[in-house]
Amino acid sequence: MAAKYVFVVAACSALAQAGIVRRDASTPLQDLEKHAAEFQKTFSEQLNAFTNSKDTKEFNTALKEGSDSVLQQLNALASSLQKALNDANGKAKEALEQTRTNLERTAEELRRAHPDVERQAGALRDRLQTAVQATVQETQKLAKTVGANLEETNKKLAPQIKSAYDDFVKQAQEVQKKLHEAASKQ
């Protein structure tokens, strides 16, 4: 009997410790928020550094191609959010809808700035930077809203949001790399 009692007390203690550790651990959406803030800062700093070099045709071409790929990724992210809307409800659904609308607006602004890259390289660079920053901010805001509302919804939506965000970041990093290569050739 004493052995059972000791076992039960040990099991309860282990469960209590696990609960404490679990509460202290960050959620995937909190990790996403933190990463988004760091990525946004790095992307802005590097883009500004690249554009302080000479404006050459090669850099402008890389800027246009980067803008194209960010535009495609913005559309993919908006599409992923639309799919996630089907699994959401309440405040999470409202946040997803607002984020998707804002991303579509950002994509449209980037699309309008696109045609005359040679003449408007500076404006396109600014729009590209704004598009990336807006996307990161919208994702952060979405993560906060979803994370603060429903743990059950969070479990369903967190992987979808994180996956879409990770795809966006990979594409934005590729843009950074190409712009860096173009700026280095000058």
Curated annotation (Swiss-Prot):
Chief location of this protein within or outside the cell: secreted
GO biological process: defense response to Gram-positive bacterium; innate immune response; lipid transport
Gene Ontology cellular component annotations, sorted alphabetically: extracellular space
Tissue specificity remark: Expressed in hemolymph. Also found in hemocytes and fat body.
Expression induction or repression: By bacterial infection.
UniProtKB keywords: Antibiotic, Antimicrobial, Cleavage on pair of basic residues, Immunity, Innate immunity, Lipid transport, Secreted, Signal, Transport
One GO MF term: lipid binding
Family, per entry: Belongs to the insect apolipophorin-3 family.
Role according to the record: Assists in the loading of diacylglycerol, generated from triacylglycerol stores in the fat body through the action of adipokinetic hormone, into lipophorin, the hemolymph lipoprotein. It increases the lipid carrying capacity of lipophorin by covering the expanding hydrophobic surface resulting from diacylglycerol uptake. It thus plays a critical role in the transport of lipids during flight in several species of insects. Has antibacterial activity against the Gram-positive bacteria L.monocytogenes (MIC=6.5 uM).
InterPro entries to which the protein is assigned, alphabetical: ApoLp-III
Name of this chain's protein: Apolipophorin-3
SUPFAM superfamilies named among the record's database cross-references: Apolipophorin-III
Signal peptide limits: 1-18
Pro-sequence residue ranges: 19-23
Description of how the protein assembles with itself and partners: Equilibrium between a soluble monomer and a bound lipoprotein form. Apolipophorin-3 associates with lipophorin during lipid loading until each particle contains 9 or 14 molecules of apolipophorin-3.
Family annotation (Pfam families): ApoLp-III
Subcellular location: Secreted
